[in-house]
Design a protein with these regions (language model features):
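Conserved donor-binding/catalytic core segment of Leloir-type glycosyltransferases
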Residues: 196-215, 220-224, 235
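A charged, aromatic-enriched C-terminal amphipathic alpha-helix characteristic of glycosyltransferases
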Residues: 339-372
Length: 372
């Protein structure tokens, strides 16, 4: 009985995530795993229509966190087919409610991450609603996100533009930028272990994250052709990007593929300059990526591509280029940067974005709102 009282005294959180629980944690996992005195049921989206993970038992990934995979919708139905659409939402709601009941969840805080989840609100019991917005959901009906933000007790927004867009729908919006595992990427505690490119002796300029189809790789292709003595590293999972075949033919381009998260810092510290590129499908986004905070945490020089009228990001420590020629010129300047010139300032920006500090800000906001 005393154990039950101890468990019930913890704040219970139902998390509807838009990303799986992973060894390479995303925003939701980074934040919730750091909230203290909580008991969390984390519902991850299915990997596809044939994903049967929902039939498995919940996976206890932390002493206070249990992960379930939601059942897939075999035949996605548009909202205009109201009866079938509602049936799908009821199915998901029953699944979540059943798991919550098994874990003795009563009046939990509901943490949402996608406008699609607004349709589950009528099928779940909760006491307090959070909407964490980390992107522009332009592919979804605006009314969905508006309704979710309007119902939420507090909205977290990853950038000023996202906060402005949601301001007509909520009077309680807190800006919460992305963050970084600062100890890992700053090299604290001797986390840098080996040289992943022992055979390369010239300058190395690197990009480290998923190579999305929409990623504009033209600046790297241009620079690789102009500077054959430089090595350009592309680290991460590769999608069907139209410029990848041409980059593969460049002898000074290294396509390293994906690697475990704990090995990424070794690759970044092997680079002389780190590169931030643009995604053509996100021309209006002002969300600062977690990748940039990882770069800053290393203290290494950074060259970032910018949209024509984009406000420069961290202009005192990041070189901002607007075209391929300027990109090449600034890469040269970055290579010539005096050691330690602004590296400590870069790392101070990374330290200020540590996920531990972001989670502490979430806790304060929830406590102020009476939700935690």
């Amino acid at each position: 009985m005393s154990f039950y009282r101890e468990v019930s005294s913890l704040k219970q959180i139902l998390c509807l995530s838009n990303e799986p629980w992973s060894t390479s944690p995303g925003r939701t996992q980074q934040l919730l795993s750091r909230l203290r005195d909580t008991q969390i049921l984390y519902f991850a989206p299915p990997a596809g229509r044939r994903d049967r993970s929902f039939r498995q038992k919940g996976q206890k990934v932390r002493p206070n966190v249990t992960v379930y995979t939601l059942p897939p919708t075999l035949f996605p139905v548009s909202e205009q087919y109201s009866r079938l659409f509602l049936r799908n939402q009821r199915k998901l709601g029953r699944f979540i409610a059943d798991k919550a009941a098994r874990h003795r969840f009563q009046s939990p805080l509901l943490w949402t991450t996608s406008p699609e989840q607004v349709h589950l609100l009528d099928h779940l019991e909760y006491d307090g609603l959070v909407y964490d917005c980390d992107r522009d959901w332009e592919e979804l009906p605006p009314l969905w996100e508006g309704a979710l933000a309007n119902n939420a007790d507090i909205v977290f927004a990853a950038s000023p533009l996202l906060a402005d867009r949601l301001s007509p729908c909520s009077s309680n919006i807190a800006q919460l930028p992305n963050g970084v595992n600062y100890p890992m990427f700053s090299g604290e505690g001797g986390s840098i272990q080996s040289d992943p490119l022992p055979q390369v002796h010239g300058p190395v300029l690197g990009w480290a994250v998923v190579i999305h189809r929409e990623l504009d790789l033209s600046p790297i292709l241009y620079a690789a052709r102009e500077r054959p003595g430089w090595t350009f590293l592309l680290l991460g999972r590769q999608e069907d990007n139209p410029l990848l075949p041409r980059l593969r033919r460049q002898p000074n381009v290294a396509l390293a593929g994906p690697c475990p998260l704990n090995e990424v810092p070794d690759w970044l510290f092997r680079c002389d300059v780190l590169l931030e590129l643009l995604r053509e499908d996100r021309p209006d986004s002002d969300v600062i990526s977690g990748r940039l905070y990882e770069y800053l945490s290393t203290g290494k020089p950074i060259v970032s591509m910018l949209w024509p009228e984009q406000v420069e990001i961290f202009p005192d420590v990041v070189y901002g280029a607007h075209d391929e020629r300027e990109f090449l010129t600034l890469c040269q300047h970055a290579l010539e940067e005096a050691p330690g010139f602004v590296s400590q300032r870069r790392q101070s920006y990374g330290a200020a974005a540590a996920w531990s500090l972001r989670a502490a800000a979430v806790s304060r906001s929830l406590d102020t709102a009476g939700l935690l």
